[in-house]
């Protein structure tokens, strides 16, 4: 559900509220826009693509991580999804009960476990991801190819900077 204030209204209100503060308004607007775009994108994808498949955003990200990385350790999936290992445990339980995911104890170290997609999980991802990508295309449809390239490069720099500041550590 979108905010009842537009992005410009929010930025204008924040700038006037903080007019006397020594802040970097451009940085505030940029990071605020990243958050707002991420939330709007996540809500759109959840409502239009994932909900019909009875998947949460977190459930999808866990399935996607396992699909992409093969048979990763649970701690790698938790980090990739940006969730705690405790949260991952609940998500794995739900996805396993649906028959999409399998958890296997490491044979070399019992403290670790690996996740893998079941045949049903593989089928789900192979059917779902093209729909997900269509949603991604909708979200960037108003950008020119050059704008899309510039946006992607700029966001990758922000991610790299955030990770360098320690943002990639476990939740």
Role assignments for model-derived ranges:
Residues 69-73:
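Short capping segments at the starts of secondary-structure elements
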Residues 59-63:
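Short alpha-helical "packing" element that flanks the helix-turn-helix/winged-helix DNA-binding module
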Residues 84-87:
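Helix-turn-helix DNA-binding motif, specifically the short coil turn and the N-cap/start of the second
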Residues 93-153:
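Charged, amphipathic alpha-helical coiled-coil/dimerization segments
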Residues 1-53:
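N-terminal leader segment of winged-helix/HTH proteins
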Residues 51, 79, 96-97:
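Alpha-helical residues within the helix-turn-helix
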Residues 1-22, 149-171:
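C-terminal regulatory/oligomerization modules of transcriptional regulators
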Residues 35, 39, 64-68, 129, ...:
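Short, locally clustered residues in the helix-turn-helix/winged-helix DNA-binding domain
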């Amino acid at each position: 559900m979108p905010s009842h204030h537009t992005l410009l209204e929010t930025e204008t209100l924040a700038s006037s509220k903080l007019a006397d503060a020594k802040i970097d308004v451009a940085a505030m607007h940029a990071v605020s826009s990243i958050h707002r775009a991420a939330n709007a994108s996540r809500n759109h994808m959840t409502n239009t693509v994932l909900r019909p498949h009875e998947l949460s955003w977190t459930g999808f990200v866990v399935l996607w991580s396992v699909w992409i990385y093969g048979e990763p350790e649970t701690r790698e999936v938790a980090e990739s999804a940006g969730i705690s290992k405790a949260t991952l445990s609940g998500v794995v339980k739900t996805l396993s009960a649906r028959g999409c995911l399998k958890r296997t104890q490491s044979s070399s170290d019992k403290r670790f476990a690996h996740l893998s997609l079941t045949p049903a999980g593989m089928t789900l991802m192979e059917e779902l991801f093209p729909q997900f990508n269509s949603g991604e295309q909708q979200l960037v449809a108003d950008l020119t190819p050059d704008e899309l390239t510039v946006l992607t490069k700029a966001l990758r720099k922000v991610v790299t900077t955030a990770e360098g500041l320690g943002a990639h550590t476990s939740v």
